Amino acid sequence: MARKRRKGGEGLVTAIGLVRFYEEVEEKIKVPPEAVIGAAFALSIMTIALDLLLKAAR
């Protein structure tokens, strides 16, 4: 049986393309890190409050 040869550079080229794509998207969106931390904090507080409300309703 003949062996199939793999192209060596495809994976690296694809990875570099993905990094460039996400860098471009990140530049367009511009979300401040404080907003991300604030949203995560608010979501965790809401989750705890909802859990307490559901436990109290039982």
Curated annotation (Swiss-Prot):
A Gene Ontology biological process term? protein transport
Keyword Cell membrane belongs to the record: yes
Q: Which residues lie on this side of the membrane: Extracellular?
A: 55-58
* Pfam families the UniProt entry points to: Sec61_beta
Q: Where are the transmembrane segments?
A: 33-54
InterPro entries, per this entry?
Answer: Preprot_translocase_SecG (IPR023531), SecG/Sec61-beta/Sbh (IPR016482)
Q: How does it sit in the membrane?
A: Single-pass membrane protein
| Residues annotated as signal peptide | none
Protein localization:
Cell membrane
Residues on the membrane's Cytoplasmic side span: 1-32
Which GO CC terms are listed, alphabetically? Answer: plasma membrane
Q: What is its main location?
A: membrane
What does the UniProt keyword field contain? Cell membrane, Membrane, Protein transport, Translocation, Transmembrane, Transmembrane helix, Transport
Q: What does this protein do?
A: Involved in protein export. The function of the beta subunit is unknown, but it may be involved in stabilization of the trimeric complex.
What family is it from?
A: Belongs to the SEC61-beta family.
Q: What does the subunit comment say?
A: Component of the protein translocase complex. Heterotrimer consisting of alpha (SecY), beta (SecG) and gamma (SecE) subunits. Can form oligomers of the heterotrimer.
Name of the protein: Preprotein translocase subunit SecG
Tell me the lineage of the source organism. Answer: Archaea, Thermoproteota, Thermoprotei, Desulfurococcales, Desulfurococcaceae
Name of the gene encoding the protein in the UniProt record = secG
